């Protein structure tokens, strides 16, 4: 397929090395998502135990692992987007 970016306003044509780099960045997404799912499953298991142990429930409420997991998900998505923009170098907002 011909380089599509020349038809997208604000994007330049990418050379093969840049396309390869973009594909490496994009390949990280599913790997990172898999780790996020593992952490989510771990936290869910902790909450299951915590409902039967008040001290553990209080600890989890104070630690806020669900909050931090959500923050990590968003930050990692933003990080991957920033990497792709660093390679593609669009000139539009």
Residue ranges and their predicted role:
Residues 43, 54-86:
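Short, charge-rich amphipathic interface segments used for partner binding and complex assembly
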Residues 1-64, 92-93:
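Intrinsically disordered, low-complexity regulatory regions
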């Amino acid at each position: 397929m011909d380089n599509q970016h020349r038809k997208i306003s604000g994007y330049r044509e990418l050379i093969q090395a840049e396309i390869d780099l973009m594909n490496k960045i994009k390949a990280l997404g599913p790997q990172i998502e898999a780790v996020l799912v593992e952490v989510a499953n771990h936290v869910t298991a902790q909450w299951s135990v915590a409902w039967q142990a008040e001290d553990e429930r209080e600890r989890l409420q104070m630690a806020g692992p669900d909050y931090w997991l959500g923050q990590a998900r968003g930050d990692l998505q933003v990080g991957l987007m920033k990497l792709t923009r660093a390679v593609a170098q669009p000139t539009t907002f």
